[in-house]
Amino acid sequence: MSDERITEKPPHQQPESEGEPVPEEEVEEETEEEVPDEQSSEDDDIDGLIDELQSQEAHEEAEEDDGPAAAGEARKIPEELLQTDPSVGLSSDEVVNRRKKYGLNQMREESENLLVKFLMFFIGPIQFVMEAAAVLAAGLEDWVDFGVICGLLFLNAGVGFIQEFQAGSIVEELKKTLANTATVIRDGSVQEAPANEIVPGDILKLEDGTVIPADGRLVTEECFLQVDQSSITGESLAVDKHYGDEVFSSSTVKRGEGFMIVTATGDNTFVGRAASLVNAAAGGQGHFTEVLNGIGVILLVLVVITLLLIWTACFYRTVRIVPILRYTLGITIVGVPVGLPAVVTTTMAGGAAYLAKKQAIVQKLSAIESLAGVEILCSDKTGTLTKNKLSLHEPYTVEGVSSDDLMLTACLAASRKKKGLDAIDKAFLKSLAQYPKAKGALTKYKVLEFHPFDPVSKKVTAVVESPEGERIICVKGAPLFVLKTVEEDHPIPEDVHENYENKVAELASRGFRALGVARKRGEGHWEILGVMPCMDPPRDDTAATVNEAKRLGLSVKMLTGDAVGIAKETCRQLGLGTNIYDAERLGLGGGGSMPGSEMYDFVENADGFAEVFPQHKFAVVDILQQRGYLVAMTGDGVNDAPSLKKADTGIAVEGATDAARSAADIVFLAPGLSAIIDALKTSRQIFHRMYAYVVYRIALSLHLEIFLGLWIAILNHSLDIDLIVFIAIFADVATLAIAYDNAPFSPSPVKWNLPRLWGMSIMMGIILAAGTWITLTTMFLPKGGIIQNFGSIDGILFLEISLTENWLIFITRAVGPFWSSIPSWQLAGAVFVVDVVATMFTLFGWWSQNWTDIVTVVRIYIWSIGIFCCLGGAYYLMSESETFDRLMNGKPLKENKSTRSVEDFLASMRRVSTQHEKGN
């Protein structure tokens, strides 16, 4: 490519200031546009442009209806390497040397061994017991039991591995946010180079639409750009950039031209450091896995206690080692539910498939359980609560000026080029449909001169010719600067001046961005016309969804990069509360200046925070979690990734970046919060199914541990090992269909309440064991007791155990009495099939060496129904007990003084650490 001289004139922008409403956010080209009498061929047809914008708006709405501190320290680049001549760039040899030293411009990939990942699913308390049982079965040459146990192990690992494999790699997705190619100055010429080959010190050319591939700073004097970095900082509109300002990788140039020097690449960029924050976030096992492992440990302890009792009795009777090992195998199989991980994982996988139909993609199965218990929802504003597009509100006009007149003047002071339109211009042109007079008159005016936004005067100026041939100067811009333009021409009446300033102040306090509009006709005086407020509006369904979230026991907190005023106004419209604070009060590292306990109270009671950076979001989630809350975080940008990963449930909303999607636990393809609330209800249904199954399965384990332990210890006899294995298989096969059961959802967040769970499970297990013990012991009465004319003891006990255990699921699945909720046909059918098979086992003596007559089988059914009624009554009484209800739904205990002291100490340490880092 031939050499290209590098000259740059300062482009202009529309204004943004902190002391007043900020109108224009996207970059105009700095070069003044001189429009001759004959319209430029480059200008787009205004009617076609308006129609296209309005058509796009309608299409977007139709689709909706359907539907910088970092964890890791950046590698510093020596300043002498950042003195590249912008007109020449780096030499090819220097590029090669720097690439060798600093590497490619891409995220470092953590290699993942899929085999190791698969083998990790064989680690855990329950898995260890299952593996020990398999080894014991192999030692006894009991290959049937060995095969069944191994099959269950691999089933559990397979389901979990497949689900986790689909989640993908967070670093890989963050890498995808980088641009693909870049325009670079090397060897004195302009070249196209792959983005991953950019090195520190490279000179890059930026223009409209450029996706910036690396961090850097602008080196073109008097340049002005507007850069969309909403996916990084959360700011809803483009940000002004001047000479010497920093720009970040993965952000987009909306308007303007200039050159930048690369100061950081790959992992050292803002996005790269965000990746390190994500990787530093809690990525452990998850709350559900912790609960499951805790249950497994307790069951394992109970198994050991039972085995000690049995071994003591056997040694006292001098029982031979082989029977002792068989007893050990039997207790091991029944004591720890071999199918618990598989059934629960399958239940959640079925729920994930159901959520997928609702356009919610579950990337981690444990997220379903976490979402069901979420108490606080931290939501990003832009694109989540709002539409992420500007809309105009009711204009303020001075006396004697019509709204159409103000609208016409504002639209005349706008670019006629499609590529030159910024968010403000688009909002005005799309809103012309509401001002038919202004729309009809717009095409009759001829543009003579157009001056894009001037960052000094903070306004856009256009000189037009009316249909009558009158020369008119139209301006729009920062309200007070427009007012100053008029005042410099002639005095403004005091009442007009006062009303105008009051309106501007009111709009600023309500969080609106505002544009002042004025004009000058011919040789006359300047006229102030009024103010047009604009805002990124809330989604149509957000307010109703927020109210529904509150009814479901959720506290919603908004975290946004926008100003406090904008955040408060958005919250006011949505009913979120107005306790919105500047994130600076949290401190750079989340510590702030308040004592730790006060900071925790401050975060807990706030309705949201504005002007936040990634570390602020991360800190808010962390503080709430330390207070004992389960926290969900919604987001759509790179800046949300760390807190999405940190949260108990990370939610990537519709339109989220790849980085946010990969960091999230659940990805939504449908827009708005309504889809999240639907998923919340579904997750609570799934949680209820899991909770019912766990209570059921623990009760079954305790049932057989108690019964078999007593039988072996007292009578020196046990059920046939093969029948024990079939009981375990039948119990889990029958309940695999619970994933498709009809289940209610709780009106409040649900959690694993282990005291309540264990209390109910123990009572169910004792009643089951008592029923089976009575069945066994009354057989030896003169007339056979409950079971008369019995054939095989093993066969009868096998049937009684199978029936009562299988029917227990109908009790635990219900919220009230077992008859208050009809089970799904899948669950009822599965239990029926298992009951039929168990009956066939008993009738024909399979594995029990003797058949049983039909009369005895009927008596077993009648006796089992009686036990079932006792179980149902006891479960209902416990579920209606105030004590159990308080344990299940009670709020977390208030922190005590020692907890608050720990919070104060941790906050102090964070402040010391932050000051030390800043000092270095």
Curated annotation (Swiss-Prot):
Its main location: membrane. It is an enzyme of class 7 (translocase). GO terms for cellular component: plasma membrane. Pfam families: Cation_ATPase_N, E1-E2_ATPase, Hydrolase. The keyword NAD does not apply. Residues 1-71 are annotated as: Disordered. It is found in: Cell membrane. The active site is at residue 380. It catalyses: ATP + H2O + H(+)(in) = ADP + phosphate + 2 H(+)(out). One of its GO terms (molecular function) is ATP hydrolysis activity. GO terms for biological process: proton export across plasma membrane. The chain crosses the membrane at residues 118-138, 143-162, 294-315, 327-349, 722-740, 757-776, 827-847, 860-876. Residues 1-11 have a biased composition (Basic and acidic residues). It is a multi-pass membrane protein. Its EC number is 7.1.2.1. Belongs to the cation transport ATPase (P-type) (TC 3.A.3) family. Type IIIA subfamily. The plasma membrane ATPase of plants and fungi is a hydrogen ion pump. The proton gradient it generates drives the active transport of nutrients by H(+)-symport. The resulting external acidification and/or internal alkinization may mediate growth responses. This is Plasma membrane ATPase. It comes from Zygosaccharomyces rouxii.
